């Protein structure tokens, strides 16, 4: 991924005037990334464990999903990546009061994309290609009500959020944690998502895809 990330960020920097780029990577890769971007003072490399401790996440998976048959088939590493991004995004100490863009590491921008409109609200991009019902089932549990969604997937290679949306999403998950009598701590996002997966019905096998950030 190092080569792709290097190309993507340098391409991004020629298209956009962004404040800072954050690369979150496993600890063993941090030195390689720092060397690759040693000439870029606008790039910061972060060990993923400082955002979401992987050992603790594994423990939470075992705790919340033990009620599921074949819970050992749960795709821990894949879900870790989803919740890692969510955890970083919801920490308001990261770029307080600013808009942020989450960008997949294996994606290179080819031309400028408009992320926000004139009212500072994110522009939504969707397609029918990856419309996946279990994602929306988890959302309904987390939001505490059934929402009528368009039959589109908003799973793209990026996500744009403004400051208000980040705060609102955090409030939704905190409310869910409290209503479910789950202990609130810095792992609240992981707990909320894993709990919602644990109580949803089993249309999708446990090794399937139940949630996407």
Question: What residue spans do the PLM features occupy?
Answer:
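Phosphate/oxyanion-binding active-site loops and adjacent basic polyanion-contact surfaces
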Residues: 1, 77-81, 213
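Short, solvent-exposed loop/turn segments at secondary-structure junctions
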Residues: 1-2, 27-30, 50-53, 105-110, ...
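Short, well-formed alpha-helical segments that are part of the catalytic scaffolds
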Residues: 2-14
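Short beta-strand/loop segment that forms part of the nucleotide-sugar
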Residues: 18-29, 45-51
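Active-site-proximal specificity loops/subdomain of glycosyltransferases
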Residues: 33-91
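GT-A fold catalytic core of metal-dependent nucleotide-sugar glycosyltransferases
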Residues: 84-126
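Conserved catalytic core of nucleotide-sugar-dependent glycosyltransferases
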Residues: 112-204
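P-loop NTPase catalytic cores that bind/hydrolyze ATP
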Residues: 205-213
